[in-house]
């Protein structure tokens, strides 16, 4: 039976409550959009497998609550993330200003070298815009991040942004990936991961790897 994926890692969505993190996640994983807003309680996640340069990448995407009362819980997930989306709402100057606080949290709690992308979400709400595209680009430049304006409503830059962060994580781990390729000959890697889905651990010869 063909293996389901070659490598697995975690991505994290962080940002203020109401910026559309859950909508981004649902659009990317399920191609669904729900206009009604229900705040995430604590942490939720979804899975998706994509192909990047011939590598089957299994992504575990964590959606964190933005409310202050959940911060102690959500910060625990920073430590095991390989990639992080910092999300603000283009119609909320406040959420944009708070990105500095979220960056500070990443610097404190996430592993060194974690890959980051800045997202200006709800780009479909142009008539409500409070944050210019140039502001987002400038902030991303200051922090050394790629930048995308997205819309879960219209599906703008959803696949592109998730694929880009996946590429950045793969590039950051290219040395490990090449080493695993060498040791495993024609197979990509050898490692096991319980995917937080309640699945039992697989046999020792499964050809998968995880940077978690």
From Swiss-Prot:
Sorted UniProt keywords: Cell membrane, GTP-binding, Hydrolase, Lipoprotein, Magnesium, Membrane, Metal-binding, Methylation, Nucleotide-binding, Prenylation, Protein transport, Transport
Lipid-modified sites (S-geranylgeranyl cysteine): 210, 212
Question: According to Swiss-Prot or TrEMBL, what is its membrane topology?
Answer: Lipid-anchor
Which cofactor is essential here?
Mg(2+)
According to the lineage, what is the superkingdom? Eukaryota
Which major enzyme category is it?
Answer: hydrolase
Activity regulation description? Regulated by guanine nucleotide exchange factors (GEFs) which promote the exchange of bound GDP for free GTP. Regulated by GTPase activating proteins (GAPs) which increase the GTP hydrolysis activity. Inhibited by GDP dissociation inhibitors (GDIs).
Major site of localization recorded for this protein: membrane
GO terms for cellular component: endomembrane system; plasma membrane
Instruction: Indicate which residues the UniProt annotation says bind Mg(2+).
Output: 22, 40, 63
Residues forming the motif Switch 1 are: 31-45
Residues that coordinate or bind GTP: 17-23, 35, 39-40, 66, 121-122, 124, 151-152
Q: Does the keyword Flavoprotein apply?
A: no
Q: How does it assemble?
A: The GTP bound form of RAB15 interacts with REP15. Interacts (GTP-bound form) with MICAL1, MICAL3, MICALCL, EHBP1 and EHBP1L1.
The UniProt entry's sequence similarity note says: Belongs to the small GTPase superfamily. Rab family.
The name under which this protein is listed is: Ras-related protein Rab-15
């Amino acid at each position: 039976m063909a293996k389901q994926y070659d490598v697995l890692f975690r991505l994290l969505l962080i940002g203020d409550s109401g910026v559309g993190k859950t909508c981004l996640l649902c659009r990317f994983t399920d191609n669904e959009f729900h206009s009604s807003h229900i705040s995430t309680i604590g942490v939720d996640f979804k899975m998706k497998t994509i192909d990047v340069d011939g590598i089957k990448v299994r992504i575990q995407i964590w959606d964190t609550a933005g409310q202050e009362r959940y911060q102690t819980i959500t910060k625990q997930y920073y430590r095991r993330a390989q990639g992080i989306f910092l999300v603000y709402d283009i119609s909320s100057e406040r959420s944009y200003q708070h990105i500095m606080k979220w960056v500070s949290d990443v610097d404190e709690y996430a592993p060194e070298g974690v890959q980051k992308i800045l997202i200006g979400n709800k780009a479909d709400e142009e008539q409500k815009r409070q944050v210019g595209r140039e502001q987002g680009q400038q902030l991303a430049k200051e922090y050394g991040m790629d930048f995308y304006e997205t819309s879960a409503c219209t599906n703008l830059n959803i696949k592109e942004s998730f694929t880009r962060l996946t590429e950045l994580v793969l590039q950051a781990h290219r040395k490990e990936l090449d080493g695993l390729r060498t040791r495993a000959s024609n197979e990509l890697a050898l490692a096991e991961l319980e995917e937080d889905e309640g699945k039992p651990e697989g046999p020792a010869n499964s050809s998968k790897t995880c940077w978690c």
